[in-house]
Structures are given as structure tokens and as C-alpha cells.
Amino acid sequence: MAGNKTILVVDDDMELSDGLRVVLEKQGYRVLQARDGQQGKQMVYQHRPDLVILDMMMPRMGGYPVLEHFRDKPEAPPIIMITANEGSRHKAYAEYLGVVDYIRKPFAMERLLDSVGKALNPQEPETESKEE
């Protein structure tokens, strides 16, 4: 259940960002939007979202500097990275920096909603497909 959870979408592609906002709001989430990593970083401190959906490649400041900034900060919300980049080393670095999920564009909205649900409700048991 979305309840009163707030999600910050940080993406310079406003068409995608607006689409995510519409879908997430229909699920009951409050959605904030930022156009680049610098604005997104400021909004994390201002609004304290419960989750951030972060694009990797953006003008001014991309996703990696945002991840690096929040890596060891206790106030950091969980972050889902979305990207059109195919490189496995990019995924490995994002995971090293602490993303809860790494989703390649284009993606099925159900895939993102599943990831959002898991990130916001980590106490729910996961399937046994994870590494042991």
C-alpha cells in the first residue's frame, strides 16, 4: 500500500518523468520531480522522500555523483537507478554505491512498480532467487 509515501523522480527526460509521475500517483504515491542530479540532491534534503528513482545520464549532474554523495549518509533514501546504458560495469558500480535496483530503459512499468514496492517495504519476504 502506497499510503503517504513520497517518491522523487530525477530524470531530464520530462516525458518519461511525467509518465512515471502519472503511474505512481495512480498507485497512491506522492511524486516530486527533478530535472538533474543537482536539483535532485537538493530536493532529497528539502523534502526527505521515501524513495528516489534516479536516471544515470543527465546534464549538469548525472546519477553517479548523486549516489557517491549519499553513499554513506544515514539520511539517504533507497535509490532505484534507471538507465539506457547497457554496460555491466555501470551496473556493478551503481550496486557498489548502494542502489536497491538497477533498471535498464526501456522497461515495463510493472517491473518498476515491483521494484518500488520492494524498496518501500523491505520487511516483506523475498523469493529464494537471491544469492545465498
Which residue stretches match the model-derived regions?
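Active-site beta3 strand of CheY-like receiver
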Residues: 47-53
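Alpha4 helix (beta4-alpha4-beta5 surface) of REC/receiver domains from two-component response regulators
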Residues: 21, 65, 86-101, 114
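Short amphipathic alpha-helix used as the core "switch/output" element in two-component signaling
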Residues: 42, 64-75
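Charged docking surfaces used in two-component/phosphorelay signaling
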Residues: 18-26
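Receiver (REC) domain active-site loop signature in two-component systems and cognate sites
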Residues: 58
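Acidic catalytic/metal-coordinating carboxylates
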Residues: 35-39, 61-65
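C-terminal output helix
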Residues: 107-116
